[in-house]
Amino acid sequence: DAQETVGQSGRPGVILSLSDGRRIDLSAREGKIGAGEEVVNHPENKQLFYAADQGGEKISRMNRLDVPQGAEYHLVLSDGTRVWMNARSRLVYPVAFGDTREVELEGEAYFEVTRDENRPFIVHAGQVAVKVLGTEFNVNTCRKQKVQTVLVKGSVQVENGGKREVVLRPGELAETVGT
């Protein structure tokens, strides 16, 4: 990204990159964002909310949320899944989920996944894929060449490039090498 959006403090802010290429500094913008997108931002609470999934959207529009060093942000996806993003993290996700619920993470985030038996939620972190139905867990890709997944509630399946799978129980940690 050659373009950098700077917030009111003069430092890079939390940036929402829309599917049409627009970049929005969330620290400087409150209320609804973008035409045709049901997204509401609350910078004072560091929260971004997407409207409930209506299941009608067929074209997958991908957005990206970048959280810089020294910041954190809370995101509610269109299916109701809640994501708490840590500093120096990036999440790529669809505006509305289709037949699958898949996101890509760089950095660290805590997920509270809305249960949906027919559409598993998958977090891709490099070569690692964490697959869930409805649970709470943390994924951290901040360590070089390692992805850590910690399960809080429910169960998750961690795959390393499709080669090896492990199912975690609450309180367990999986550390995968080779991202």
Per-range role (PLM):
Residues V150-L151:
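Propeptide (latency) domains of metzincin metalloproteases
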Residues D1-K146, E159-G178:
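Short acidic/polar, Gly/Pro-enriched loop/turn segments located at secondary-structure boundaries
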